[in-house]
């Protein structure tokens, strides 16, 4: 006689579906210093109470599933479950709330941004209880921050390596972004650097295409760097994009850059992935390379106000994963960025300790302990007339990157670089003398143009250029 399988109801277990809020909505909970805190902007489906929607987010990003399971009795749910501990309505919005969720630290692998995001945003955004969901901010506790290496070098070490202090660094993305041969590409790099820029940059699209294979580009760019350094007496850099189809190929390209003696490489961290980025950041620290990060694909994730993930979260993740520079919008150029919001995540990139400030979109106080800072890069549709505003907004610890604003100069790349360097130094000097860049900016540029023909020509070309569109990235 064959044995029969008998199903018994265990003590404390009752099969079936129950509301998430019965277990995961805990308004009485007092957060711990070790909790990872998340602020979600959520729009519940009609008929779904906000407490249920918030609890669903907490459950699905921790221990919950759609039905009660008997294996719940084999662990301590009270220790490991996420908790929705507060819900507040969003002012001026109908049926929209900020749900605050606390995640126990033991839910996350040490030093892994990949695991952090897989847990917190990996599954909940398709959940039916919410019509829309956006992760606005994360609080990373110091105990978890200390499990990450972070940026390969950080702001102070970079300045020491470059021997450049007291001003923003200046860069240029080589254009056209695609189609140049390696030799012509290197020529464009040389002209920009000898004109006075600190950096030039591969576009994020440039990897290793038929018109320009990566090794050829690396060799011609290295030649351009060394020649411009010999002529100017300044240390120069070019962001050689090491992003590739496999992590192994990426590391091979970074190793080649190190062998050539160039100071910095680049990675597209969202399309390349956090695991690859963290590996590259470790390699860069071990081998003395700076790491420039491009955020290609970010607007797919963060541009919609009600759904996705705010860039301040991606910026925090990058500081954990590792990068010495990251693109952060301009406020004044062609790419997205409201001033208060942008400065909020710029401070999260650079500063050691940032206080909660909802007026700038900072939902939690963040202590980075000993993690190095990241230089924000302002890039996209900017030119010499923007220099006063950029200097006033971003300050010295930034990279101001002019692509078309250098290469579009009527006299060529080197005069375009001269114009940007003169404009930058004029703004820094005026600021140091106590002048108001926001109010006197145009006058400062005009005064500098009187003794710089290169700047005067640039001012004439771009005097009417504006990008006046309503920003989407608002509080």
From Swiss-Prot:
The active site is at 175 (proton acceptor), 294 (proton acceptor). Its cofactor is Mg(2+). The modification N6-carboxylysine is found at residue 201. Mg(2+) binds at residues 201, 203-204. Its EC number is 4.1.1.39. The record marks 334 as: Transition state stabilizer. Its main location: plastid. Keywords: Acetylation, Calvin cycle, Carbon dioxide fixation, Chloroplast, Lyase, Magnesium, Metal-binding, Methylation, Monooxygenase, Oxidoreductase, Photorespiration, Photosynthesis, Plastid. Gene3D superfamilies: Ribulose bisphosphate carboxylase, large subunit, C-terminal domain (3.20.20.110), RuBisCO large subunit, N-terminal domain (3.30.70.150). GO terms for cellular component: chloroplast. It comes from the Eukaryota. It is found in: Plastid, Chloroplast. GO terms for molecular function: magnesium ion binding; monooxygenase activity; ribulose-bisphosphate carboxylase activity. It is an enzyme of class 4 (lyase). Residues 1-2 form a propeptide. GO terms for biological process: photorespiration; reductive pentose-phosphate cycle. It catalyses: 2 (2R)-3-phosphoglycerate + 2 H(+) = D-ribulose 1,5-bisphosphate + CO2 + H2O; D-ribulose 1,5-bisphosphate + O2 = 2-phosphoglycolate + (2R)-3-phosphoglycerate + 2 H(+). NCBIfam families: PRK04208.1 (NF003252). Belongs to the RuBisCO large chain family. Type I subfamily. Heterohexadecamer of 8 large chains and 8 small chains. The basic functional RuBisCO is composed of a large chain homodimer in a 'head-to-tail' conformation. In form I RuBisCO this homodimer is arranged in a barrel-like tetramer with the small subunits forming a tetrameric 'cap' on each end of the 'barrel'. HAMAP family: RuBisCO_L_type1. This is Ribulose bisphosphate carboxylase large chain. The gene is rbcL.
